[in-house]
Amino acid sequence: MLGIIIDSISTFMYSKLLVILLIGAGIYFTIRTKLPQMRLFKDACKAVVEKPEDENGVSSFQALMVSTASRVGTGNIIGVSSAICIGGFGSVFWMWVIAIIGSASALIESTLAQIYKKKGKDGECYGGPAYYIEAALHCRPLAIVFCISMIATYAFGFNMLASYNLQSTFSEFSFYDTKWTPWIIGGILALITGWCLLGGGSRIVKVTSTLVPAMGVAYILIAVIVMIINHAYLPVVFSKIISEAFDFQAIFGAFAGSAMMQGIRRGLYSNEAGIGSAPNASASAQVSHPIKQGLVQMLSVFIDTLLLCTATAMMCLSSGIAPAQELQGAPWVQAALHESLGNFGPLFITVAMVLFAFTTLLGNCFYCDNLLNYIHKGQPSKGFMKGFRIVSSLVVFIGAGMEVSMLWNISDVLMGVMALINIPVILILSNTALKALADYEKQKKNGGNPVFRARDIGLEYETDYWG
């Protein structure tokens, strides 16, 4: 009964509210920022490698890796597989649409996070939707509601789902026992996650900045190899992606399973553009201008969906193994790669899932640390944080043995609540970000390295960093 209720809420949110909100906001921001996805792509690449003035500060690259660690997760494999198996080839197109227009939303929200970030008692930068909701809208209760919804989404919903997706990958191996193996794998993952979490935020940044680039490069390399092997199928694959994306039945028929709805659901789950998660990481970066980190987070959306999600889609669709609802998730991906690469294929996917899930768990918990700092108006006690991290690790263990459809629906609903709070807020505050963008481009045009001062855009709010 509970599962039916949650599924109904999820279907309503993604068939009506979030379709209008996500696509509408993305188009609005794309127009107002004059197509930054193309116009400022070069600037985004340059901003990634910029060094912070303080040697001990978090660089743009490190902030990108933390946000990408959360974005690049099991959704890039299992989420894409599920979307295609349920919604068909056209789901891929709608994932691309959400990524391209959603990246403009990512630019706005991360710029706002930089402008309104605060300096903690420990000297670190803290920011995100909660901070700009309180500072600009003077509504701390709404900010706390957002924090609670995000903690529920990431520490519980997403982390349980990542744990389940990881253990399900092993179901293709002969040693897998449906009664015991999920709990054994969940226990091992929980122990490793707990060890890393108890090392604090600095260890999270260090681990993710090492794992994410290697993981992404290896995954794309394998995808390219598979596409070369199956190159004869690619024209047909692209043709079906486009034709099914605009098929009336695929868009409107049985909407819960339509290409559009599945593309939006899994695209949002994968790249997180506009839901308010990445700003918590982007605020920690030390940059000379807020727009630089906004551009970096725009690039992170491209990395996630246009590279990694597309890699999964092309690997599977070009294999000749037809997608089917009973194969959704790991089984279809493993079958597709086995067809192209033999026994190496399922083994590679298993390794990729382990790395993707692990970096997802760490990135998610980094966000929760930031949120707890906000709720407590400073660093919570060591005892509280230790207890929270132990509970977070236990959640990872529990998720491994839960029922998958319930986990997907819970995650979708919780993520939708975040979007329903954050997107209207960034629409209201977008003029501040747009003024910052104009200031950035004016300084670039004059030939200098853009340096932001709040008073230059008429911002009366007394910031901690941009006086």
Predicted regions and their residues:
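N-terminal alpha-helical transmembrane segments of multi-pass membrane transport
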Residues: 1-74, 84-91, 102, 427-467
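Transmembrane helix-loop junctions in multi-pass membrane proteins
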Residues: 2, 18, 33-37, 75-80, ...
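Membrane-interface loop-to-helix entry segments
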Residues: 21-28, 32-45, 165-170, 181-229, ...
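Alpha-helical membrane segments and immediately flanking helix-loop junctions
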Residues: 54-86, 112-130, 134, 151, ...
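Flexible loop linkers connecting adjacent transmembrane helices
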Residues: 35-60, 82, 88-91, 104-137, ...
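Helix-loop-helix module between adjacent transmembrane segments
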Residues: 25-30, 98-123, 129-130, 134-164, ...
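Extracellular/periplasmic helix-exit of transmembrane alpha-helices
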Residues: 30, 108-117, 224-240, 254, ...
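Selective recognition of specific alpha-helical transmembrane segments in multi-pass small-molecule
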Residues: 101-109, 187-201, 212-232, 265-266, ...
